[in-house]
Structures are given as C-alpha cells and as structure tokens.
C-alpha cells in the first residue's frame, strides 16, 4: 500500500529539503526517457513522412519548393494486419482510406529508389474511367474539376475499368503532367499515402482532409 504523509505547513522562509536521488535512479530515468523518445520517433516516422515538391505537375495548387506531410497510417496499418483480411490487398482503399480527389504520393514503378510522384486521385478500384471531350468521366458521370483551367486531353489509357487494387491518378497541370494517362493505373502497393498538410511556406499552411 502506498504511504500517505501529512503535509507540513512551512513558513515563507522555510525550504523543504528534497531527497537526494541516487545516481542509479537518475540513470534509470534517463534510460526511460531515451526509450520513450525512440519509440515516439519510430512511431511518428512510420505514420507520417515529409516531402518537398519538385514537380510542376500539380500547379497551380502545388508548386516546387513547397513542403508537405503525408499520412502513411493506412499503409502501416495494412502491413501490421498481416494474416488478416487485409493481407490479400494490404494497400487497398479500405486499408488506406483513400477517397477520390485526395492528393496522393506514390511510386510510378516498383523501383522505390526513384522519387515518388504527387497527383490527384481520380479513380478507385472497380471504377470505369474515361477521358473524352476535354473531361474526365467516372462510371459515366463527368467529374467536376474546378481546380483545372484547361481541358483534359488523353492519348493512352483513356478508357478502362480499374482492377480490385488499382488507382488512377492525374496531375492538376494536365498539359505537362506525367500521370495515369501515360503509365496506366497504379497498384495499391505503390501508394505511400495521402497529403494531409502543406507546412511550408508558413503563409501557405494548409490542412487537407
């Protein structure tokens, strides 16, 4: 049982002596702090990642030099649940929680030594994606894209139905963007995560849902 001691009333000039802590106790406390800090660092680095934008393909909404934070929570959560229902497609929409029009960072190929791309998610698994007449259509309905200033052209991968673990991405700067119109749909295991914050420059700080 913990002991309870009665608090003494001290005068204004009285100094209550503090018990001296042994060097062993101090060392244990330092080790605890170091352990907690290490766990926090590993946890945060698993769930989020920071990137600097180097591409113009998302202008005018994102510019080179801006810095963003990407949530990797879905990717990490899916990998932690190995052996469960997520194991078949650990990076599926259910695991990552991706939604259309979110800004997503992903790898174009399986070579993850190459810099990732940042694009807008247009099509989810099972969607019928079609690009014609200057617009993008999902399941035969035209997608409103108020963030665009020019029509959308396409010469390849212009009409397709996405597979069970495939995603279709487009850049906002359509005339210069290298995206799913050129390299096709992206499998879920290449997705890093969605952009949740632009934190630099500070005057352009933005939170993304």
Predicted regions span which residues?
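Extended hydrophobic leader/signal-anchor segments used for secretion and membrane insertion
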Residues: 1-209
């Amino acid at each position: 049982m913990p002991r309870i001691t009665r608090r003494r009333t001290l005068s204004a000039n009285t100094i209550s002596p503090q018990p001296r802590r042994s060097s062993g106790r101090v060392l244990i406390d330092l080790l605890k702090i170091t352990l907690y800090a290490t766990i926090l660092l590993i946890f945060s680095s698993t769930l989020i990642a920071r990137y600097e934008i180097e591409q113009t393909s998302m202008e005018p909404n994102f510019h080179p030099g801006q810095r963003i934070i990407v949530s990797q929570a879905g990717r990490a959560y899916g990998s932690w649940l190995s052996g469960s229902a997520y194991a078949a497609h650990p990076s599926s929409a259910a695991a990552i929680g991706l939604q259309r029009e979110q800004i997503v960072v992903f790898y174009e190929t399986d070579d993850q030594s190459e810099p990732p791309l940042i694009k807008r998610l247009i099509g989810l698994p099972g969607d019928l994606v079609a690009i014609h007449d200057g617009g993008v259509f999902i399941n035969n309905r035209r997608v409103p894209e108020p963030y665009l200033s020019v029509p959308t052209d396409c010469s390849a991968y212009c009409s397709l139905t996405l597979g069970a673990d495939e995603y279709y991405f487009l850049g906002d700067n359509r005339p210069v963007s290298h995206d799913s119109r050129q390299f096709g749909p992206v499998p879920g295991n290449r997705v890093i995560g969605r952009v949740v914050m632009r934190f630099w420059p500070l005057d352009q700080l933005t939170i993304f849902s």
